């Protein structure tokens, strides 16, 4: 960062985690080795700046690597995340990682972030977590527009669509679990919806392969 801004086409290191930006100064990837750590203090100003002019009212500054897993607090580890993603789906993934770390296993993650055109706000975040030679891929829809429907298992699309119709919800994330031979073992599709009083709820469809 120079004067609080990320630089274009740069690779930089924060707390041992490696980040890459594109020619629009946006973080597009992060390779990390999360560890349990004291929670780094928040940088509220940096969190409020994430997404710039493309930030939406429901967005928060979401840490790519959690502050309690040796993730930096500043703008180099932040993207604009919809609050439903940041506080639920992404947090669920972080809790999965922390549980794995608590089992004494080494964990590595690779995060890939995609954007629409020149927007500073991500459309999709994909995190590949490797632990015990097994991979888990988490896909997050930051727009909550059901664009992940195309990535659900073909044989269960009807069941997933029925659940979407019942709840009037959207697919907020997908979790794919693989074995050591990289065979897909289980897919969990998470659906976010509101009830009549406006409270957010989540439900899921689990598909075994």
Regions found by a protein language model. Name each.
Residues 5-196, 200-207:
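Domain-level detector of nuclease and nuclease-like folds
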């Amino acid at each position: 960062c120079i004067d609080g801004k990320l630089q274009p086409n740069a690779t930089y290191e924060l707390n041992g985690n490696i980040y890459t930006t594109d020619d629009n100064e946006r973080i597009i990837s992060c390779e990390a080795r999360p560890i349990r750590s004291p929670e780094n203090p928040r940088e509220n100003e940096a969190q409020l700046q994430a997404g710039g002019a493309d930030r939406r009212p429901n967005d928060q500054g979401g840490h790519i690597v959690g502050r309690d897993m040796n993730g930096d607090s500043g703008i180099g580890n932040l993207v604009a995340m919809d609050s439903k993603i940041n506080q639920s789906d992404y947090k669920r993934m972080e809790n999965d990682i922390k549980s794995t770390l608590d089992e004494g296993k080494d964990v590595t993650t690779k995060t890939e972030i995609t954007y629409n055109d020149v927007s500073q706000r991500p459309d999709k975040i994909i995190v590949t977590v490797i632990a015990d030679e097994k991979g888990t891929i988490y896909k997050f829809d930051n727009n909550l527009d059901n664009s992940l429907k195309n990535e659900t298992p073909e044989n269960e699309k009807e069941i997933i669509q029925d659940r979407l119709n019942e709840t009037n919800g959207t697919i907020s994330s997908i979790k794919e679990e693989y074995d050591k031979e990289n065979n897909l073992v289980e897919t969990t599709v998470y659906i976010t919806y509101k009830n009549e009083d406006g409270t957010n709820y989540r439900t899921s469809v689990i598909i075994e392969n």
